[in-house]
Each structure stands twice: as C-alpha cells, then as structure tokens.
Amino acid sequence: MRTQRQVVDYALQRRALLAEVYAGRAGVMDVCDATPYLLRAAKFHGEPSSVTCPVCRKEPLTLVSWVYGNELKHAAGSARTLDELNRMAMLFEEFSVYVVEVCRTCSWNHLVQSYVLGTRGVGSRRSRRRTAAE
C-alpha cells in the first residue's frame, strides 16, 4: 500500500510549455531533449501510459519514476518501477518520487508529478508534541 503525500502536479506548466511550442515561440528541439540515460530508463523501468505524445503524436508516452532521498544512499537518483516503489515505501521512512513522461520516438520529456513516499506518518497517528522527558 503506497501512501502518497505532498503531491505536486505539473499539468499547468506542461500545458503552458506545449502552448508555446504549438504557437511557434518555443522550438521542438528545445523541448525534445531527453538524454540517452532517460531514454534507457524509460525502456527498462518505465510504465506505459495511455497518453499519446503531444509533440510527434506517434506513440504513447512512458512514465519514469525517479527516487531521491538521504536515506536511500546509493539508490538515490535512480529510476524505479511501480513494484519497486511499493517495496521501498515499506522499507524507508521518507523519500521523494519524481514522475517524468518520456516519448521514446521524439525525446519529448516533462515532469508530470512529484510526491513523497515512505513509512513516516503511516500507522498510529501519534501527536507531534513531546514531553520534556523525551
């Protein structure tokens, strides 16, 4: 069971950027700039999406989840599958997840969502107040 907290959706930012591209104020080469590392992560760790690429309109986008957090140590900054995220959410107290949509055809990529996962705050709803003895 995943408990997403502090969810941030970047849909408005995405929409504004695409409006700039469609109006010709931003170049396609400026927004289709996925690195080879991101494209490989999409191939091996990505989850297929039902949304078609807004730039090339040739294939469905792939969602890649990147994890960051002090507690993750060597795993920080790596792409993870949804199954791995579920397992990590039960093992670690708190870490951030950034979901990026990627088109493997034209290299379009954009941050879609970010949220926090982990065991912090799961279970008993203990008061944050502590006595002086603690």
Language-model region placement:
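C-terminal/domain-terminus segments
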Residues: 2-8, 113-134
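Short, flexible, mixed-charge glycine/proline-rich loop motifs
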Residues: 36-50, 91-97
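N-terminal alpha-helical interaction blocks
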Residues: 1-36
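Short metal-binding segments enriched for Cys and/or His
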Residues: 82-97, 104, 109-113
